[in-house]
Amino acid sequence: MLLLFRLACIIHKTKVNPAYRPIVIIEEPELNLHPKLQSRLADLFLGVHRKHGVEFIIETHSEYAIRKTQALVKVNEFEVPPNENPFTIVYFDKDGLSTWKMKYRPDGRFENEFGEGFYDISGNLTLDLI
C-alpha cells in the first residue's frame, strides 16, 4: 500500500511539473505478495512508465514478475521495430562476480539463460513429483 501511495505522489509531481522525470528504485517489491499480484507489478510499472514517463529500477527475485515482462514483450511486440522495449533485465550471478543483460526475443523468451537456481527450480521440483 505504501508503494502505491508513493507512486501516486510521484505521478502528481509529474503532472505539476512536466519536466520532472524521476527514476524510482525499488528493492523486492514482491515481498509478501501473492504470485498473481507479483506478476501484476510488471503491469503497474509499465503503465506508470507509459502514462507518466517514470523510469524504474527494480531489484527482484520474483519469477512471476520476470515472466510477466516476457509476456508483455510478446503481446505488445516490444522487440518488433519500430517499437522500443521498455524492459531491461540484468542478471547477477549468485557470487556477484558476473552480470549479463538478458536479451528478449520477439516471442518474449530470452536469448540467453538465467543462471542455475532461478527458472529451473520449479521445473526440477515438478519432475520430483512425477
Regions found by a protein language model. Give the residues of each.
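Switch/communication elements of ASCE P-loop NTPase nucleotide-binding domains
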Residues: 1-127
